[in-house]
Amino acid sequence: MNIAINTDFFEDINSPELYLRLASEAGFRRIMWCHHWNTDFIYAKPEIDRIKAWLKSFQLQLQDVHGTDGKEKCWYAVEEYRRKAGVELTINRLLMLKELEADGTLIMHPPRIRVEDDASRMELVRKQGESVRRSLDELLPLLEKYDAKIALENLPHGNWEILSALLDEYPADRIGFCFDSGHCNITKRPHYEESEKYASRIIAVHLHDNDGSGDLHQNPFSGTFNWEWLAGVLKKSSYTNPLNFELNCRRTPFYDPASSDHTDELRRFLADAMERGSRFARMCQA
């Protein structure tokens, strides 16, 4: 089954070579680049060239790149110097997307108001919303130049105020929605209703499961997420790429923290991910 998996299913820093090889051996032919998804790391040309060689060697097609809102460099920072640095960081990932010939999107986190935020925090996040609009305005010409898209992701506990506004304000041919099933399912603030409303804007997916208690990134059909509902939504959506699964072996029964070599655990985890992911892909095709 032609489905994709994230590169950081065990760790999101250091060399991904082992994880690319194991994913390929498990039958995956597509990946989402997810290393350094929450750092200020800038990929230099020698690193991108090395990644390109690995992808060719392991017969892997890059689908999406998970961008980063950074630590100090942040595309929605209210401090202008940090925001501009965040735009440069985003451009780095956009160029990486094109250099590695990805056929998907650049996935980015927007600012979000969480259900537990007080008034002062909400005021700050709304200012961050204005910052991210300035960043998107600066990035749109590059998206046009490279014929690329940014997918804005629904985030845990977010109330959708900013995400829905951005999707309403920006053109669908450049700015879309990355649907994250695990974030949708967290019971503190489920996202089922809003996700269905914006199904026509889905251009990327992060598929994983949990029990509703937190962002566990477990294999499909191991938690409480409503996969039958999602199959129906995706059938009616604008999404056309192969399904992408964003998983974490460390939060599954396959992981043994006492082990010094996790290779066999990862092989079992990936085999299970392939079986469960393919099962859901068949549901979407039925």
Specify the residue positions occupied by each region the protein language model found.
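Active-site acidic/histidine proton-transfer and metal-coordination neighborhood
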Residues: 17, 54-57, 75-176, 264-269, ...
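N-terminal-biased segments
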Residues: 1-16, 45-51
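Hydrophobic faces of well-ordered beta-strands that scaffold small-molecule active sites
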Residues: 3-7, 31-33, 62-67, 104-108, ...
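Glycine-rich, proline-tolerant flexible connector loops at the mouths of alpha/beta enzymes
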Residues: 32-56, 109-113
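Active-site beta-loop-alpha junctions enriched in small/polar residues
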Residues: 6-10, 34-38, 67-70, 110-113, ...
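Charged helix-capping and loop-helix junction motifs
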Residues: 44-50, 83, 87-90, 125-133, ...
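A short acidic, helix-capping loop that chelates divalent metal ions and anchors anionic groups
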Residues: 37, 71-77, 114-122, 186-187, ...
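Histidine-acidic metal/acid-base catalytic patches
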Residues: 1-3, 13-27, 137, 145, ...
